[in-house]
C-alpha cells in the first residue's frame, strides 16, 4: 500500500520536466560552453558517455548528444519549427548583470544588446545569448 506522503511527493513531480535532450554539431564546443554556465546555475555532471553528456539539477537533467555526420548539414535555426530557446531562472538583476559580464568575457554573442536587460519588456529583466549552435538561451531574474 502506498502511503499518503508518497502520493503527495509524486503529485509534486507531476508536470515537471524530466529531461531535455539536444543534438549538437560539435560536442566538445558545447561542453566548453555549457559546463561553466550550468555549473553556475547549480547543475552537476550526471553522466558522460560516448557521444554525449548530461547535467542534472534536482530531478531534471539536460543531455547534449553529438549529431551524427549524416544529419549535420541542415543546421539549427530558432525560427524554424522546433525549439526557439531555453530559459533559466536566476534570482536577481545583479545575477543577470554578473552573467552578462561573464558571457562578454567569453565572447558570447549577446542578443538584443540595445534593449538589455529589458528586451522582454520594462518589468522583465534577462540576458539573451546564443550557444555554439546558435540556440538562444535566456537567463531571467525571478526578482527585479
Model regions: which residues?
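Vicinal oxygen chelate
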Residues: 17-25, 76-144
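Hydrophobic alpha-helical signal peptides and transmembrane signal-/tail-anchor segments
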Residues: 1-7
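Core segments of cupin and vicinal oxygen chelate
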Residues: 21-68
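Acetyl-CoA-dependent GNAT
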Residues: 66-70, 141-144
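Alpha-helical elements of the RecA-like P-loop NTPase motor core of helicases
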Residues: 31-32, 97, 137
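Short beta-strand/turn micro-motifs at beta-sheet edges
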Residues: 70-76
Amino acid at each position: 500500500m502506498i502511503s499518503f506522503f508518497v502520493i503527495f511527493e509524486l503529485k509534486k513531480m507531476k508536470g515537471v520536466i524530466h529531461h531535455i535532450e539536444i543534438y549538437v554539431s560539435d560536442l566538445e564546443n558545447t561542453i566548453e560552453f555549457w559546463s561553466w554556465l550550468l555549473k553556475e546555475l547549480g547543475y552537476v555532471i550526471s553522466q558522460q558517455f560516448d557521444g554525449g553528456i548530461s547535467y542534472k539539477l534536482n530531478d531534471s537533467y539536460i543531455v547534449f548528444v553529438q549529431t551524427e555526420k549524416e544529419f549535420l548539414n541542415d543546421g539549427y535555426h530558432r525560427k524554424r519549427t522546433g525549439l526557439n530557446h531555453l530559459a533559466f531562472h536566476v534570482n536577481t538583476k545583479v545575477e543577470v548583470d554578473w552573467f552578462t559580464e561573464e558571457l562578454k568575457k567569453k565572447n558570447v554573442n549577446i542578443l538584443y544588446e540595445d534593449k538589455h536587460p529589458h528586451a522582454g519588456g520594462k518589468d522583465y529583466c534577462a540576458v539573451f545569448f546564443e550557444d555554439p549552435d546558435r540556440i538562444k538561451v535566456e537567463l531571467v531574474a525571478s526578482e527585479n
